Regions:
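Short, flexible loop/turn elements at secondary-structure junctions
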Residues: 75-77, 107, 165-169, 360, ...
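Conserved P-loop NTPase motor cores
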Residues: 449, 455-475, 479-487, 495-504, ...
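A short, charged
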Residues: 469, 473-493, 879-914
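Extended, folded cores of ATP/NTP-driven motor/assembly subunits in large transport
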Residues: 1-429
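P-loop NTPase motor domains
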Residues: 84-96, 298, 394-451, 457, ...
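Anion (oxyanion) recognition and catalysis
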Residues: 190, 377, 489, 509, ...
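Charge-patterned, long linear interaction tracts outside catalytic cores
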Residues: 440-449, 456-472, 484, 625-658, ...
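Conserved P-loop NTPase
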Residues: 825-878
Length: 917
């Protein structure tokens, strides 16, 4: 039909008649001309992309003339000699001929995945913590996008590392070969602890857009549609950009991208030094950057033969008489001798290519470029813009596009020859620690990696939940601990703080916590012995069910015990070693005897609770380390449990001690002296008001602060109160809420460490199995020193902490670390830890098995005002409260000193919309 119309149109035109309904022109033709003019000849970006479709089940991505696969990996943190050797062998022996392996790292400003996980875990704490969550998220997202202030040390990033592989599409055989190598690659990455994750088509859409069409605004997560071409889904419409000589201008976002290639390489380099290309400890690259490094096994037998031939000719030429004095020829020959020797020992001839993309706002791109070049120059790399080939260079950085664009890169001299051992040193797989995969306290690495720290997460599954904080006055210790406390409360962890100095007053009041001040007006009574007799009742019931082989889920349902405690009961009943039972097992003791009325009673108590009580009473009686004395006290505890049951207290224990008889019916030698030592803590004693029976304290708030300022000059009493509180809390969770986790923070522990070391050691060894975390905070490492040989418990407390947090140190503090065999290797890093002079952040070295990193604690204005321990801020808040403002209103007023807070309503609404997408 259309052909007939076309012929009639030509005929009409030949006869001088008008066409197209007598209008004399073709509307479609005119429209296309106008469109060409409107768009200035622009073509859809997707037309330049080669992706066709992705198969998520197999992980294969099909493109025009090529196929590929890819993984996201965890970065290497720190130096690792073995991985260099292993990857060298892998590249030499396993990289298929015709294969292209790309290592890609994206220093993204998009930290939403990290913040989503962080926010998702924060389900408790009420309105105040919800408000803090919203302010903190807005603050961190602002830091991640604020390239102009990158030099303040708070530019947050999310480094994402990928390994991609591409090869020619040879049909079914090609796919089979790809899948075979994909399996080998996955196994190798996993063997090197790089935690490979097979990427999907959704990942490709997201990363492809981030490379080609970066946006500073929050984007919805893409969803791959199998019915449509993959390239069309990567490139968004109506996102115009202009390719210029030395940059790509993104008109909608106002951003500019530049691609660079190394013009000169350092003479020597190692894998551990690649971290320096991500930024320095004190200077960030003020823009989003991407590093793409590709190795290609594409020379074939002919190419390898040509390489060897070139080397042989160079060596022979250097032996000629006319080149004996030619230093250049001699040096070239020497290098060829070395290269041929390495090749003979198994290293392969490969090709390599490296590209770096930098993206920043148009008005800031020149500064960002200068910082990038300066950073690379410092490390003996010289970068040059890929002038006139920005389009090809940017497309060649896309995942799995290296096979397709290699010839173009080679034509423009962006490839080099290299040996398989040489390329490993340039792999961009170094990075910063990504933290734990659970919500916790937020930190920013020195090079920007945003991460969570949660003491309840055990790396590798080993260790406990304890942590040590070492920081002198003024280093930001109390500030950091308040951040840890609020992070735990938001996860339904009950937090108890033993404080000296009222540092936690604001956060306690704001979060509706309980502040208990030990002074002459204090009417609280602590009696951990009241629940001692029943400490093992529920556990014994669970143990009987375990012996009946009842399922753990049913045991949990009937007893309320956590799976962790049920497992601990199994270990306690097993034939495990004494050391394993102490740290991981719960053992139940049966105590049987006559009560006051002569009735036979049986009590089931935990072994740990008896040991806690013995350690506490030993401190009161001054017999720590005295085997006989501690044995007498243990006997008194057992008899007290039998005689008084849940009515047991210190006054009654004193009576039991005074009445102890030996096998001959005579008074036990020394027992009466111990009873006298307990007198100050009885009903009639000076400190009896703290320990009387009847008013059994129960701490139900999510945050409880024990303010011990007025006891700090009586260190023995302070040590006793500390131990009683710790035992009381543990017994509460042992006999009451048996599924909730709890954290005990002992601030300024250096004051009482020598008086309560034995108790704290035992507590540190055992609290994990009851769901508890112990945080001990001191001013320097000497608090845990055992150089004299008599402070084994103090040293053990340090050893029993899986996590160590170290803040900025004084000269004396550094001397202690330098003298420690355990910390000598970390001395340079510890010495570099600093608190920002402008109070924008405090650095914390986080040390555990498998990770030693530095994180920067940077908080929003609201949190800063809430956590502040500055005298002027305390006075300001008190004045505002006297004026009638609530604590929240006073903190809002103080926050203006530290920054501007956004209106929460639109933030929360936007977050809700994004979460619903």
């Amino acid at each position: 039909m259309f052909a007939i119309e076309k012929h009639f149109s030509k005929f009409a035109k030949f006869c001088g008649l008008k066409t197209s309904a007598e209008r004399g022109y073709d509307p479609m033709e005119e429209t296309m001309k106008a469109l060409e003019n409107d768009t200035m000849g622009a073509k859809p970006l997707s037309n330049s992309l080669l992706y066709e479709f992705g198969e998520d089940s197999s992980g294969v991505v099909f493109s025009k003339d090529s196929i590929g696969c890819w993984f996201e990996i965890a970065p290497i943190v720190g130096s690792n000699d073995s991985i260099e050797k292993n990857l060298t062998l892998f590249f030499a022996d396993e990289l298929p001929e015709g294969g292209y392996l790309q290592f890609l790292i994206v220093a993204s400003h998009d930290v939403s995945n990290i913040l989503d996980m962080w926010e998702k875990g924060r389900e408790h704490g009420g309105e105040e913590l919800n408000r803090l969550t919203a302010y903190r998220r807005h603050f961190i997202e602002g830091l991640a996008s604020d390239f102009s202030n990158a030099d303040d040390g708070r530019l947050a990033r999310n480094y994402r590392s990928f390994v991609t592989y591409s090869a020619k599409d040879n049909g079914e055989k090609g796919v089979e070969a790809l899948l075979k190598f994909k399996k080998k690659l996955h196994n190798k990455l996993r063997a090197e602890n790089l935690s490979p994750r097979q990427c999907t088509a959704n990942d490709l859409i997201l990363i492809g857009r981030d490379i080609l069409q970066m946006s500073m605004s929050k984007q919805s997560k893409p969803k791959y549609n199998v019915l449509n071409n993959l390239s069309d889904q990567i490139a968004l419409p109506f996102e115009p950009n202009t390719i210029e000589i030395d940059q790509i201008t993104h008109h909608k976002s106002g951003l500019v991208s530049k691609v660079f290639a190394p013009k000169e390489l350092p003479e020597s380099f190692c894998l551990a030094e690649m971290i320096n290309l991500l930024g320095s400890d004190y200077r960030s690259i003020p823009g989003r950057f991407i590093i793409s490094y590709t190795i290609a096994n594409n020379l074939g037998a002919k190419g390898i033969s040509a390489m060897n031939g070139a080397g042989t000719r160079s060596i022979h030429a250097a032996e000629k008489s006319y080149t004996k004095n030619d230093l250049v020829a001699q040096e070239e020959a020497r290098q060829w001798v070395e290269v041929k020797a390495l090749h003979k020992r198994g290293e392969s001839f490969l090709q390599e290519s490296m590209l770096v993309m930098l993206t920043a706002p148009k008005e800031e791109i020149e500064i960002a470029e200068e910082v990038l070049k300066s950073l690379y120059n410092t490390n003996d790399w010289k970068l040059e813009p890929a002038k006139r080939i920005m389009r090809i260079a940017s497309l060649a950085m896309l995942p799995m596009m290296q096979y397709s664009y290699w010839k173009s890169l080679k034509f423009f001299k962006l490839t080099r020859y290299a040996l398989s051992g040489e390329v490993v040193a340039k792999l961009p797989i170094q990075g910063e620690w990504r933290g734990v995969p659970t919500s916790g306290a937020l930190f920013i690495g020195r090079r920007g990696q945003l991460f969570n720290w949660d003491p309840f997460f055990r790396i590798g599954g080993g260790g406990n939940y304890n942590f040590i904080v070492i920081a002198p006055p003024g280093a930001g210790k109390s500030f950091a601990l308040q951040e840890v406390a609020q992070s735990m409360i938001s996860k339904d962890v009950a937090v108890f703080v033993l404080d000296i100095g009222a540092s936690y007053k604001n956060i306690c009041k704001l979060l509706d916590g309980e502040m208990i001040q030990f002074n002459h007006q204090c009417n609280i009574s602590l009696n951990p012995f009241a629940t001692l007799a029943e400490s093992g009742a529920v556990l014994m019931k669970a143990l009987q069910m375990i012996e009946q082989r009842i399922d753990a889920e049913e045991i949990q349902l009937k007893t309320g015990l956590s799976f962790e405690r049920i497992e601990a009961l199994k270990i306690g009943k097993s034939g495990a070693s004494a050391e394993t039972k102490e740290s991981d097992g719960i053992e139940i003791l049966e105590i049987k005897g006559s009560d006051e009325l002569g009735n036979i009673k049986t009590h089931f108590v935990t072994k740990d609770s008896i040991i806690y009580a013995k350690a506490m009473l030993s401190t009161m009686c001054g017999v720590n380390g005295d085997v006989r004395g501690e044995a007498i006290i243990e006997r008194a505890i057992n008899e007290g449990v039998v005689k008084y049951g849940t009515r047991l207290d210190i006054t009654k224990l004193r009576l039991v001690l005074g009445d102890l008889k030996d096998g001959k019916g005579e008074a036990v030698e020394g027992a009466s002296r111990f009873a006298d030592c307990l007198y100050p803590y009885t009903e009639e004693g000076t400190h009896g008001r703290f320990f009387a029976s009847g008013a059994d304290a129960s701490f139900k708030k999510m945050l409880t602060v024990f303010e011990l300022e007025e006891l700090k000059n009586d260190e023995p009493l302070l040590a006793v109160v500390l131990q009683v509180i710790l035992m009381q809390i543990t017994m509460q969770f042992l006999c009451g809420d048996r599924s909730r986790r709890f954290m005990l923070i002992v601030d300024e522990a250096w004051l009482i460490l020598d008086f309560a070391a034995s108790f704290l050691e035992r507590f540190a060894r055992t609290v994990r199995k009851y769901g508890g975390s112990l945080g001990v905070c001191t001013q320097d490492l000497t608090s845990f020193s055992n150089l004299c040989g008599t402070r084994k418990s103090q040293a053990a407390i340090l050893e029993c902490a899986t996590w160590k947090l170290i803040l900025q140190q004084t000269a004396d503090g550094m001397a202690a670390f330098s003298a420690s065999d355990s910390y000598k290797k970390h001395v340079p890093l510890i010495a570099s830890i600093r608190k920002c002079s402008q109070n924008k952040f405090s650095e914390v070295m986080i040390n555990t098995d498998g990770a030693t990193v530095v994180g920067r604690l940077a908080t929003d204005a609201y949190s800063t005002a809430m956590f502040s321990t500055e005298d002027t801020d305390f006075k300001f808040l008190m004045q505002k409260e006297r004026e009638g403002l609530s604590k929240h209103e006073a903190i809002m007023a103080l926050s203006k000193k530290y920054g501007t807070l956004p209106d929460l309503a639109p933030i929360r609404n936007r977050s809700l919309r994004v979460n619903n997408i």
